[in-house]
Amino acid sequence: MGLLQEKLAKYDLPQKFMAQGVYPYFREIEGKQGTEVEMGGHEVLMFGSNAYTGLTGDERVIEAGIKAMHKYGSGCAGSRFLNGTLDLHVQLEKELAAFVGKDEALCFSTGFTVNSGVIPALTDRNDYIICDDRDHASIVDGRRLSFSQQLKYKHNDMADLEKQLQKCNPDSVKLIIVDGVFSMEGDLANLPEIVRLKHKYNATIMVDEAHGLGVFGKQGRGVCDHFGLTHEVDLIMGTFSKSLASIGGFIAADSSIINWLRHNARTYIFSASNTPAATASALEALHIIQDEPERLEALWEATNYALKRFREAGFEIGATESPIIPLYVRDTEKTFMVTKLAFDEGVFINPVIPPACAPQDTLVRVALMATHTKDQIDRAVEKLVKAFKALDLL
């Protein structure tokens, strides 16, 4: 055994949870991701999906992908920089830019590669990156790849953000990067106050709208639109893997920023471009969420009903303001156990443990879709109450 194998062989935490029968990852789904999914030959209520608009199984989205494959083939065989740009990519970029209210947009192969490529491309050694300490892992990795000076502020603590800004050279670029909706806790960034501090300290703002697009704002344009601050946010990032029912991501900004990123963001230049099917499916989903406002209304009807039911049942759900509902457990082992008990009762939820949260903040994450019914929500709440009570958590 080599030194690397010796080092990595010591990592046996997954095996310990497997031995206890509570390992919760890589569970296999045997069909489309709707509100109910086929797993192990059984129907399971799906409350662990990020498909907020409920479009992943929509026949129009599927058919758009099929047609694109017939026209363009299964892949692009190159990066956008060289032979991998399709007219379909350009159309999607134009429509995304218009949708989020920016001059231009660039499409990347995944949402993760947007943040891991854009962030280091924007700053150098003389600049500063300032992040919320609960920003997504892709933002964390993006700032780690940057040569800039890096600062963090306590979650949604605007006084601490101001303290960090005061540490910066006033003549240097100061890039504040924040999740619009925090993916584990479901709360929103305090964007109005961040914008105020932007002007006070001559900073730049980048908002990750991964969990805001299709959920907040007019026609689902995101948290920036929800606050009426699109024009104050310099860069807007989004993904296709949630409300747009596909895979990929984008960054939108003014033309000068996009021109720079187009020629300097390494994950854009050196990654193969989005497949034709993924691009066409995202484009069709974008059309649907604009054409069907009732879908957004249904999402919020389901969300508000679920929030009411979980609160009435006595769950601790924190400060969530979104279809992401955290049910706090505050114990890693019990978080895995409650996930297993819920699954045994036919409810799929996601466990959240460090490093996705602080050790004292472990939780199970419930997520709503526009297509969830009140009956499905009621059944899920009933089963989760049973699971939590079995572990003396309620």
Swiss-Prot record:
UniProt binding sites for pyridoxal 5'-phosphate: 111-112, 183, 211, 239
Keywords: Acyltransferase, Lipid metabolism, Pyridoxal phosphate, Sphingolipid metabolism, Transferase
Superkingdom: Bacteria
GO CC aspect terms: membrane
Range of residues in the leader sequence: none
Pathway this chain belongs to: Lipid metabolism; sphingolipid metabolism
E.C. code: 2.3.1.50
Keyword NADP: no
Residues with the N6-(pyridoxal phosphate)lysine modification: 242
Cofactor: pyridoxal 5'-phosphate
Enzyme class per UniProt: transferase
Role, per record: Involved in de novo bacterial ceramide synthesis. Catalyzes the condensation of L-serine with palmitoyl-CoA (hexadecanoyl-CoA) to produce 3-oxosphinganine. Also capable of using alanine as substrate leading to the formation of 1-deoxysphinganine (1-deoxySa). Contributes to the levels of endogenous sphingolipids in its host.
Further comment: The bacterial ceramide synthesis pathway operates in a different order from that in eukaryotes. Furthermore, phylogenetic analyses support the hypothesis that the bacterial and eukaryotic ceramide pathways evolved independently.
Family the UniProt entry places it in: Belongs to the class-II pyridoxal-phosphate-dependent aminotransferase family.
The protein's name: Serine palmitoyltransferase
Gene: spt
